[in-house]
Regions:
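Bacterial N-terminal signal peptides that target proteins for export
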Residues: 1-9
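C-terminal motif of bacterial Sec signal peptides marking the signal peptidase cleavage site
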Residues: 17-18
């Protein structure tokens, strides 16, 4: 090999090593995030719970999440499946709605129910994927979606563009969901960028 060829080969090896190192780091961060998430969190008038489930056709890191919120003196329950994976060297969260929520209402107490989960039971919230990064300085993970790609049903109304952000630490879970029309006017959700915080129980 000529000196130039050796230099090219060395650069290629260094590039591959850097890529491998990044991939390994993301896998380690995903494992840490998946270990932090399970649990029950309580905030003002609401509770959010995450339980890991076995659904390998989606991902190795899949959770059933259920939120109970007091509205008009009664509890309103919402359910989702969320899955985490590595894509393009980034931690990506995909979210799914359940076709028959009543079938899974005992899912928190009996996560083995989800061993019968199939693709037909799920509806992917396409375009609403969240990218997660680790904030080492504040010992937290931070997630956000791309609003312009995420059209989702807002409570009590039709489709709108959803701006979603979330944080997870060893002590709490926080999130914000704000809805906008095509012109960028806010339709629902908090007016500022503050997150609703839920303490781990």
């Amino acid at each position: 090999l000529t000196m130039a060829e050796r230099a090219v080969a060395l650069c290629a090896l260094l590039f591959l090593a850097a890529c491998s190192g990044t991939a390994d780091l993301r896998k380690a961060e995903l494992s840490e995030l998946a270990g932090l998430l399970p649990g029950t969190y309580e905030g003002a008038g609401a509770s959010v719970a995450f339980v890991p489930i076995y659904a390998p056709f989606i991902s190795d890191n899949v959770f059933f999440t259920e939120e109970t919120r007091l509205q008009g003196g009664r509890g309103e329950v919402s359910q989702r499946i969320v899955a985490f994976d590595i894509s393009d060297k980034q931690i990506v969260q995909a979210s799914y709605l359940l076709a028959d929520p009543a079938r899974w209402r005992a899912g928190l107490q009996h996560p083995d129910l989800f061993k019968s989960l199939m693709e037909a039971d799920l509806k992917l919230l396409a375009g609403c994927e969240m990218l997660w990064v680790k904030d080492k300085e504040r010992s937290r993970f931070v997630g956000a979606n791309d609003r312009k790609n995420c059209r989702s049903s807002r409570p009590g109304s039709g489709l709108a563009f959803l701006d979603a952000r979330a944080e997870i630490t060893a002590d709490d879970y926080a999130r914000s969901e704000r809805y906008f029309d095509a012109a960028g006017r806010q339709l629902a959700g908090p007016r500022d960028e503050a997150l609703d915080r839920f303490r781990r129980q």
